[in-house]
Amino acid sequence: MAEKKKGKTITVEQIGSPIRRPKEQRATLVGLGLNKLHRRSTLEDTPSVRGMIAKVEHLVRVVDEA
C-alpha cells in the first residue's frame, strides 16, 4: 500500500451566516465542511480550496496555515 504524502493544511472558521446568501455561497460553505457559525474545518491547502475560500472570504476567516 502506498504511503500518502502529508501536505500543507489550512484551517478555516465560519464567521458569517449563510442566511440570505446566494445558493452558490451556501454550497461553497458546505463544500468547505462548514455549516454553523464558529465551526472550524481543516482542509488540504490546494488551489481549489483556496478558490472556494476566496468565493466566501466575507463569511470565513483563515485561522491557521500549516
From Swiss-Prot:
NCBIfam families: rpmD_bact. Gene3D superfamilies: Ribosomal protein L30, ferredoxin-like fold domain. One of its GO terms (molecular function) is structural constituent of ribosome. One of its GO terms (biological process) is translation. The lineage of its organism: Bacteria, Pseudomonadati, Pseudomonadota, Alphaproteobacteria, Hyphomicrobiales. It comes from the Bacteria. This is Large ribosomal subunit protein uL30. Keywords: Ribonucleoprotein, Ribosomal protein. PANTHER family: LARGE RIBOSOMAL SUBUNIT PROTEIN UL30M (PTHR15892:SF2), MITOCHONDRIAL RIBOSOMAL PROTEIN L30 (PTHR15892). It comes from Chelativorans sp. (strain BNC1). Part of the 50S ribosomal subunit. Coiled coil: none annotated. Signal peptide: none annotated. The keyword DNA-binding does not apply. Belongs to the universal ribosomal protein uL30 family. GO terms for cellular component: cytosolic large ribosomal subunit.
